[in-house]
């Protein structure tokens, strides 16, 4: 007789056998305009952010290197250091962007861009001086920089997606190497969970744990190793227990080691929990996960969109001004949920917002502001914003 773990594994294998590996590919029929816009935006990105003689990119346009301070780092010293090149996080957005174009079109041109441009530049951040090996927040030729678990999780997801598209083992090997680093950032404090930064283990953040769950579940799909499923499920449950707002089903930002919760709400955190719940529903068929995902989706639609009426136009739901890459990651959750319930309401809101942004938030160089209404302009255009627009 099979034990419970064997039974679960057998059921999961049946689900995977019935689930096409092509679910991450979006149908191109009817999306020609969106695809053309994505290609144009990628061209604008490389035209305006490339650094001659390298595969690296600037962080902003215009660059104004001495005037820019990255606000998303842990180290004050590193924050105030002028950098010629983008930090890892904004650079990594190009991986997701090119992956999305490759997945959508199947065009080997994007596989070439990935292998010969994106991943060549990415390896400039790969740190082999510390163990486990992982990607650092800045290039290796500079002084040693912090390593973030969330930065690496996003890359692990991308490498796994590329493996699922190509079945080339080198991508899966890199994803599994990254997973080893992620696991090194877990312990029993607060009952589990992944820290945010390797050098400053002071908090466990939704931005590490929610995508950590997605990453593990994708690795399960790629390898059929049920250990990844168990880890992904546990990360989902830990994050839900410790960081969900029970009033609207959205997710808070982090919990420190004293148990104090930072109650800021960002689109990507809730979006990744929506995606994880949708994957868990896909793999188990348990309705509670579908309900979880649908509750988060409703909360996100209410919180991150606004009622907007353009001049001489019909009212619609427009994405609020904010971090555009956070919005792109939230969209991943809505896409995954759509695979389960076929409710197109939320994707329609995204489509209308992106269409409006094309006409109102895009400048003469083909770069986007963060205010999709077009009422305010950014002083500089962030690399990660442009990559996010390509992905969406």
Language model regions located:
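Well-ordered alpha-helical scaffold segments within catalytic/enzyme domains
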Residues: 92-108, 154-168, 211-225, 272-286, ...
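Extended ligand-binding groove/face enriched in aromatic
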Residues: 111-219, 226-230
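Oxyanion-binding "anion nests"
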Residues: 269-284, 289-305
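Bacterial N-terminal signal peptides that target proteins for export
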Residues: 1-9
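CBM-like carbohydrate-recognition segments
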Residues: 29-97, 101-150, 204, 295, ...
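Bacterial lipoprotein signal-peptidase II cleavage site
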Residues: 22-27
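Active-site cradle of extracellular carbohydrate-active enzymes
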Residues: 207-212, 216-219, 228-280
């Amino acid at each position: 007789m099979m034990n419970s773990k064997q039974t679960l594994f057998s059921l999961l294998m049946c689900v995977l056998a019935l689930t096409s590996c092509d679910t991450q590919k979006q149908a191109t029929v009817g999306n020609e305009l969106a695809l053309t816009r994505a290609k144009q935006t990628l061209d604008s990105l490389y035209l305006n952010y490339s650094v001659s003689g390298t595969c690296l990119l600037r962080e902003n346009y215009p660059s104004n290197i001495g005037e820019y301070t990255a606000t998303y780092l842990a180290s004050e010293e590193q924050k105030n250091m002028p950098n010629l090149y983008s930090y890892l996080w904004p650079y990594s957005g190009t991986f997701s962007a090119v992956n999305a174009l490759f997945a959508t079109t199947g065009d080997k041109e994007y596989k070439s861009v990935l292998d010969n441009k994106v991943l060549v530049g990415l390896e400039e951040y790969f740190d082999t001086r510390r163990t486990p090996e992982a990607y650092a927040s800045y290039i290796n030729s500079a002084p040693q920089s912090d390593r973030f678990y969330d930065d690496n999780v996003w890359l692990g997801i991308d490498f796994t997606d590329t493996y699922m598209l190509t079945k080339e083992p080198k991508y899966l090997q890199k994803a599994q190497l990254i997973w080893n680093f992620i696991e090194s950032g877990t312990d029993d404090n607060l009952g589990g969970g992944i820290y945010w930064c390797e050098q400053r283990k002071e908090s466990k953040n939704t931005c590490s744990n929610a995508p950590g769950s997605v990453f593990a579940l994708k690795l399960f799909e790629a390898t059929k190793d049920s250990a990844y499923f168990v880890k992904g499920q546990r990360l989902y449950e830990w994050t839900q227990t410790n960081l969900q707002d029970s009033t609207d089903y959205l997710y808070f930002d982090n919990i420190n080691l004293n148990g104090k919760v930072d109650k800021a709400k960002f689109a990507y955190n809730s979006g990744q929990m929506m995606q994880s719940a949708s994957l868990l529903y896909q793999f188990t068929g348990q309705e509670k996960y579908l309900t979880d995902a649908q509750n988060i989706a409703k909360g996100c639609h209410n919180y991150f969109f606004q009622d907007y009426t353009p001049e001489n136009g019909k009212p619609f739901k427009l994405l609020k001004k904010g971090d555009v890459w956070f919005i792109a990651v939230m969209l991943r959750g809505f896409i995954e949920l759509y695979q389960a319930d076929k409710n197109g309401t939320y994707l329609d809101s995204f489509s209308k917002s992106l269409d409006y942004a094309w006409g109102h938030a895009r400048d003469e160089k083909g770069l986007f502001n963060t205010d999709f209404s077009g009422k305010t302009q950014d002083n500089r255009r962030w690399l990660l914003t442009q990559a996010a627009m390509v992905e969406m």
